[in-house]
Swiss-Prot record:
The UniProt record lists the keyword Cell membrane: no
EC number(s) reported in the record: 4.1.1.23
Superkingdom of source: Bacteria
UniProt-listed InterPro entries: Aldolase_TIM, OMPdecase, OMPdecase_AS, OMPdecase_bac, OMPdeCOase_dom, RibuloseP-bd_barrel
PROSITE patterns, per the entry: OMPDECASE
Organism whose genome encodes this protein: Mesorhizobium japonicum (strain LMG 29417 / CECT 9101 / MAFF 303099) (Mesorhizobium loti (strain MAFF 303099))
Complexes and interactors: Homodimer.
CDD domains in UniProt: OMP_decarboxylase_like
Single Gene Ontology BP annotation: 'de novo' UMP biosynthetic process
Family in the record: Belongs to the OMP decarboxylase family. Type 1 subfamily.
Pfam families noted in UniProt: OMPdecase
Name of the protein this chain belongs to: Orotidine 5'-phosphate decarboxylase
Amino acid sequence: MQAKSIQAQSIQERLIVGLDLPTVREAEQAVRELDGVVSFYKIGYQLAFAGGLDFARELASGGTKIFLDMKLLDIDHTVAKGVENIVKMGMTMLTIHAYPKAMRAAVEAARGSDLCLLAVSVLTSMDEQDMIDVGYEYDPHTLVLRRSEQALHAGMGGIVCSAAEAEAVRRIVGPDMAVVTPGIRPAGSDHGDQKRVVTPAQAIRNGASHLVVARPIVAASDRRAAAQAILDEMRSA
């Protein structure tokens, strides 16, 4: 069984802006400022637990694509029931931690829907020392590739990984699965808490299907110009 993947038709559809903002009011303002430039948004924990789930439904009902970044991980039954309800919300993408049983449960629960399930491989904020600290025997690159194979075999629609690993991941998963890359930073920008970062153009060249960009856009003084500059860089790849 294969979960639905997603094929972007334009560069604009390949840019996902992370609404990493504390309130729905601020997120609404960001969406207004980006109207006509951005058509795909990510909503994660910060906004989700401040009324962002209702906001996600509202945006989705109007045709905006929403990537719900929940990184689900629990026993199979709990993951499946969560996915079943998220399917009803009309979301475009949903993240599941790349544990085989959780992924298989999610794929079964999303069967027949348009929800693209993304396997979270290794957080882009983690480096090799972080992996050692939490007890993994693999370095980030090796674990990303292992989990990419597991996601493919589980029938997931895509994989979330650093753009630094996107080229190797693409070779494993083939041309049809989504390869979604956070940790994107324009050349010369602050890396923040991200450790494995890549520029927008390099991410596209490495085989990423979608780029997730938050702070470089939502924290910019001119969000619209910041988003347009990243789109222009993506087009130059």
